[in-house]
C-alpha cells in the first residue's frame, strides 16, 4: 500500500485506521469502525499439533511492539516448547544450545493484544475481527459504579474476586459515541482509581486494564538466565622433571 511494505519494516498501519463501509448504492453499512483490524493470530495451544505436522520453526510477531510484549510472548512460547521436548525427548530436541531458567511467569493477556484468533487452523472460519478498536483494550476488570464531579475519582465494580490494581496501571473504555479512550491510574486503592479528569467517563462504562504496571516491572526486573554446558578435563602426569598438567574445555555449542 502506498509503495510501502510491511515485510520490510515500513507498514502503513492501515489496519489501525477507521473507515466507513459503503455499498454500491452509497448506503453506509458500517460507520467509523476499524474495518481492517484483526484479532492477533495465536496458536500457543496448538504448538504440539503443529510440531507433529512437521513445523520446525515458529515466528513471533514483534513488529512495532514494545520490549515487554516481545519478552512476554517469546517466554510463553519457549516454555511451551520446553514442555514438549521434556515430555517427548525421543521425538524432539531444541534447535538451540543451552537451557533457560528463572525469570518471570509469562501471561499474554497482560501485554498488547487485540483479542486472539486461530483463523483457519481447523478449516472453519472463526471470529477474526477487532473492529471496535485497533488498539489493545486489555482485560476487562469491571464497570464504573461511581464518579466524582470532575470525573477524576472512579469507583469500580469488579468482575472477579482476585483483581488487584496498581499505581500507574493503564485503563481503556468505550465512550458513549463508540470511541475508545483511556487514562492512567495515578493512585489505585482497592476499587478506587484516582486519575486526571476524564470527561468522557460515565456510570456503567466497562473498564479494561491494558497496562499492568506491576507485571511490566516484573518483566523488567526478573531476567531469564541462559546456561550452556561446559565440559572441563584437567589431568596431571608425573615425568622425570616433575609434574606436568594439561587442561581442556569444550562447550555444547
Report the location of each language-model feature.
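Surface-exposed amphipathic alpha-helical tracts and adjacent flexible/coil segments at the periphery
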Residues: 1-253
